[in-house]
């Protein structure tokens, strides 16, 4: 009994560390993306980062993943479409039609969508009152960070609607990855397969959006280092660690760490881009951390 509890605690601790590590990286991707956007379009960044991620995972785990049934194959297809193609494309298109603040706040409700879907479609994952209270507190903090003292409400129906769809799509991805995790496939191999389908379904978008195959832009050290950071770190490494965390903690507990992304983004922007941190941002960060703590606490 004691040995079983110790094993469970070790699994939980590992899951929390992996989720925190992932979010620390993902929270800084905004800075890299901002640098790349000077010369490279959003869809180009998206394609190249996941292509690099896929090739790295293929190099690390070249073995073919033998899927037991076509039903299981559909789980990988769905995860690739939702977690790689649709989520990032919808988020980028939303930014064209609405403000970055609106998108930042709306996308941060992903843990709530994930909790609702997990409650209905995953065994042993239930939506609790504590989670809802924590969600409300964290969301208020995220709103403060996004607005940063400029309390001007700007509604852009199309862009805001797309921004709402993005976290719903991420929630579907989280649930699908939890189901894939239950099948006991190798985490790196499973993530690589998800990337493969994500890239396949991304191809039509290359014709719909402006896409330039010119690789000469990556001879620029800033462009090269940042696309490698996104491809190696934020994609290849972090999707593996995130998917492993989902397997260990469950979709709901892991998703709570998404609340921390705006906080990490603000801190990294201040350190690297010299952007100013105000008392409103500090209060927002405190509320976000408090909300995530309440959501994670056991009864």
Task: Give the ranges of each region predicted by the language model.
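C-terminal-most transmembrane helix of multi-pass membrane proteins
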Residues: 2-8, 12, 17, 48-51, ...
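Hydrophobic transmembrane alpha-helices of multi-pass small-molecule transport proteins
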Residues: 57, 77, 117, 129-149, ...
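Helix-helix packing/entry segments at the starts of transmembrane helices
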Residues: 46-48, 103-109, 176-200, 231-271
């Amino acid at each position: 009994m004691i040995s079983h509890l110790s094993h469970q605690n070790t699994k939980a601790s590992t899951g929390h560390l992996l989720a925190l590590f992932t979010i620390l990286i993902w929270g800084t991707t905004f800075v890299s993306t901002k640098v790349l956007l000077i010369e490279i379009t959003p869809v180009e960044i998206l394609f190249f980062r996941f292509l690099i991620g896929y090739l790295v995972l293929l190099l690390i785990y070249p073995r073919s993943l033998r899927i037991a049934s076509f039903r299981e194959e559909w789980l990988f297809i769905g995860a690739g479409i939702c977690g790689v193609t649709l989520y990032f494309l919808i988020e980028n298109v939303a930014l064209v039609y609405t403000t970055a603040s609106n998108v930042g706040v709306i996308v941060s409700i992903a843990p709530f969508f994930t909790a609702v879907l997990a409650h209905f479609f995953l065994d042993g994952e239930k939506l609790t009152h504590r989670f809802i209270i924590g969600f409300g507190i964290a969301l208020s903090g995220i709103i403060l960070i996004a607005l940063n003292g400029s309390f001007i409400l700007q509604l852009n129906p199309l862009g805001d609607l797309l921004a709402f769809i993005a976290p719903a799509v991420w929630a579907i991805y989280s649930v699908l990855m939890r189901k894939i995790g239950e099948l006991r496939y190798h985490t790196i191999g499973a993530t690589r397969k998800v990337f493969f389908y994500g890239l396949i379904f991304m191809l039509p978008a290359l014709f719909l959006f402006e896409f330039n195959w010119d690789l000469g832009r990556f001879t620029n050290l800033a462009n090269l280092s940042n696309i490698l950071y996104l491809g190696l770190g934020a994609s290849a490494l972090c999707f593996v660690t995130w998917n492993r965390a989902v397997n260990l903690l469950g979709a709901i507990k892991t998703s709570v760490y998404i609340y921390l992304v705006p906080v990490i983004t603000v801190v990294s922007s201040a350190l690297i881009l010299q952007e100013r941190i105000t008392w409103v941002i500090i209060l927002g960060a405190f509320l976000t951390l408090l909300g995530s703590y309440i959501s994670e606490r056991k009864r």
